A protein has these predicted regions:
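RNA-binding accessory domains that recognize and position tRNA/RNA substrates
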Residues: 1-212, 216-217, 231, 344, ...
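Proline-centered loop/turn at the N-terminus of a beta-strand
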Residues: 106, 179, 250-252, 268, ...
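Beta-strand-turn-beta hairpins that frame and shape the catalytic cleft
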Residues: 175-180, 288-291, 329-334
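Active-site-proximal beta-strand elements of phosphoester/diester hydrolases
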Residues: 179-184, 294-295, 335-339
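Cysteine-nucleophile active-site neighborhood
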Residues: 216, 220-221, 225-301, 346-364
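Catalytic beta-strand/loop cores that center a nucleophilic Ser/Cys/Thr
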Residues: 290-331, 369
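A glycine-centered loop/beta-turn motif at secondary-structure junctions
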Residues: 326-368
Length: 369
C-alpha cells in the first residue's frame, strides 16, 4: 500500500506503508543509530514524535520482548529507508512491520531519508504527518491536504511527562542494599537494570510525587529519569524538585532529569534546531579532560551561561556544538548529565556514572552514622 509523508512546509514524500494504516501527526525528528531501533521506538523520550532513522536498513535483527525500554511504542510514527522483511537473529521473535502493527504505529518506507534528514538539519525539526488515506500531492485532494496541513502546523507536544509517567509506585529488587528512589519522568527500563545489577533496591515513583512522599520512603539516593517534551512545561515537577533537593539526599539526574534540575536551580533551557538523537555524540568532561562517546535523545538543552554560579557549574559539554551536557551542583548533593549513561541502544562508556552516584550514596550513609 502507498504511504505519504507530508511536512509542515508542504513537501510530500511518497513511499510504501509499513506497520499500521491511517493518519498520524507528530514532530518529525531524526535518529542516527545503526542499531537499537526497538529501544528507540519504546523509549518514552520520543513521545509525540515521528522518528526518521538515518541508517538505510532497519529491522535486520528483528524484535523481541527483552529489548523493550517500556511496555509500548511511544513514537507517533516511524520513517525508514527500508524495513527488513527477513530478519536474522537467534533472539528474533517478529519483524519490524508486525511489531509496528501490534502497537498500532503508522510507518513509511521507501523514501529518501538522507534528503529528509538534510531538510531537518537545515530547517530544524518540523511537524509532519504519515498517511495512507490519500495522496496529498494529487490536486484532486487539495481540500483534504489543506485541512491536514492546518492540523500539522497546529500540532504541539503537550503534557508529555503527565502522559508517560507511571500511575503508582513500583519496587524492584526489594532485598537490595541501597534504596534508590527513581523519579519516573519517562523512565527507560535500563536505568532500573543498571541500578538493580549494582545491588540496589529501586522504588519507581510517579513524576508528581512530592518531597514529603519521597522523604517517607527513607531513600539512600534519588535518581531523576529521562523523559519527553519541553522541560519548562511541567512546572509542578520543577517546584517539587526544589523541595526534594532540600532533603540533601544524593541525587543523580539523566536527560530530562538534568534539565528539570537546572530549571529548579534558576537556569534556562532552549530548544535545539534539530536535537541530539543517536549513539555517537561526543561529550568532553572538564575534570578529566576526556571525551566520551554517548547515547543521546533530546531536543532541548540547558543554557549553561544561565546557571547561577552559586548553584553549580557546567561539568561536561558536547564536543560538536558546545551545549551543556552535565552539571555539578554546589548547593545540592547532586550531579546531572544530559546524555544516557544507561545507553540501550548505544555505547556504555559512561555507565561508570552509576558507580559514582552509588559512591556518593555510600559516603552519605557513612557520614550519617
Amino acid at each position: 500500500m502507498n504511504a505519504y509523508l507530508l511536512l509542515a512546509n508542504g513537501m510530500v514524500f511518497a513511499g510504501q506503508s509499513v506497520g499500521a494504516q491511517g493518519v498520524t501527526v507528530g514532530e518529525v525528528v531524526f535518529a542516527t543509530g545503526m542499531v537499537g531501533f526497538q529501544e528507540t521506538l519504546t523509549d518514552p523520550s520520543y513521545y509525540g514524535q515521528i522518528i526518521t532513522q538515518t541508517y538505510p536498513l532497519i529491522g535486520n535483527y528483528g524484535m523481541n520482548k527483552d529489548d523493550m525500554e517500556s511496555d509500548r511504542i511511544w513514537a507517533k510514527g516511524y520513517i525508514v529507508r527500508e524495513a527488513c522483511t527477513t530478519p536474522s537473529n537467534w533472539r528474533c521473535e517478529e519483524t519490524l512491520d508486525s511489531f509496528l502493527k501490534k502497537n498500532n504505529t503508522i510507518g513509511i518506507e521507501g523514501i529518501d531519508t538522507r534528503h529528509l534528514t538534510r531538510i531537518i538539519r537545515e530547517s530544524g525539526v518540523m511537524n509532519g504527518a504519515i498517511l495512507t488515506t490519500f495522496d496529498p500531492a494529487d490536486p484532486a485532494n487539495k481540500a483534504e491536504t489543506e485541512a491536514l496541513l492546518a492540523q500539522i502546523r497546529a500540532y504541539a507536544v503537550t503534557d508529555a511527562v503527565k502522559n508517560v509517567t507511571c500511575e503508582k509506585p513500583e519496587v524492584f529488587n526489594p532485598q537490595g542494599e541501597a534504596h534508590i528512589v527513581l523519579m519516573h519522568y519517562g523512565c527507560k527500563r535500563n536505568i532500573v537494570r543498571c541500578l538493580v545489577k549494582r545491588g540496589c533496591k529501586v522504588t519507581v515513583m510517579p513524576a508528581f510525587a512530592t518531597a514529603e512522599e519521597i522523604k517517607a520512603l527513607a531513600p539512600d539516593g534519588i535518581m531523576l529519569s529521562n523523559g519527553p517534551g519541553d522541560p519548562a512545561e511541567p512546572v509542578e515537577v520543577i517546584e517539587n524538585l526544589k523541595h526534594i533537593f532540600e532533603l540533601n539526599i544524593p541525587t543523580f539526574g539523566i536527560c530530562l532529569g538534568h534539565q528539570l534540575s537546572a530549571l529548579a536551580a534558576g537556569a534556562k533551557t532552549m530548544k535545539l534546531k534539530y536535537g541530539h538523537r543517536g549513539a555517537n555524540q561526543p561529550v568532553t568532561d572538564f575534570e578529566s579532560g576526556r571525551t566520551f562517546i554517548t547515547s543521546q535523545t533530546h531536543g532541548y538543552a540547558v543554557v549553561g551561561d544561565e546557571l547561577p554560579a552559586e548553584m553549580g557549574e557546567v561539568a561536561q559539554v558536547n564536543a560538536n556544538d558546545g551545549t551543556c551536557e552535565g552539571i555539578k551542583y554546589k548547593k545540592w548533593n547532586c550531579f546531572t548529565v544530559q546524555f544516557h549513561p544507561e545507553a540501550n541502544g548505544g555505547p556504555k562508556d559512561t555507565e561508570f556514572l552509576f558507580d559514582r552516584f552509588l559512591n556518593n550514596v555510600k559516603a552519605a550513609k557513612k557520614e550519617a552514622r
